[in-house]
UniProtKB/Swiss-Prot annotation:
Keywords: Cytoplasm, Stress response. Disulfide bonds: none annotated. This is Anti-adapter protein IraD. The keyword Cytoplasm applies. It comes from Shigella flexneri.
Length: 130
């Protein structure tokens, strides 16, 4: 018996579609962080005041926070292939994180920085995502 094989050529994502994908992921992540009914655990999205009651300089706490946030984001955002979470600042009244993201169908890493500011998360990098 002769076996036939089918080959499918997958279309490459154009630069414009990649840019739209990146912006969409960042926008959705920012919405997830700022949602009052977020699926993420309270400490991960609220930052303050919950962060203040803990010792923000505790390296064990920082490592735990990054692991928990990474796990939750990978669960809730299926377009992310790989993720690294880093704390940029962790002080009593300041919490800044950097997400190093690899998306499916995108060969370039995406950096998304978030800062806890006046009771909500904001992004300094969303406008620059391309």
């Amino acid at each position: 018996m002769m076996r036939q094989s089918l080959q499918a050529v997958l279309p490459e994502i154009s630069g414009n579609k990649t840019s739209l994908l990146r912006k969409s992921v960042c926008s959705d992540l920012l919405t997830l962080f700022n949602s009052p009914h977020s699926a993420l655990p309270s400490l991960l999205v609220s930052g303050m005041p919950e962060w203040q009651v803990h010792n923000p300089s505790d390296k064990h706490l920082q490592s735990w926070y990054c692991r928990q946030l990474r796990s939750a984001l990978l669960f809730h955002e299926p377009r992310i292939a790989a993720l690294q979470v880093n704390l940029k600042e962790a002080y009593c009244h300041t919490l800044a994180i950097s997400l190093e993201i690899m998306l499916y169908h995108d060969d370039e890493p995406l950096t998304f920085d978030l800062v806890w500011d006046n009771g909500g998360w904001r992004s300094a990098t969303l406008e620059n995502v391309s």
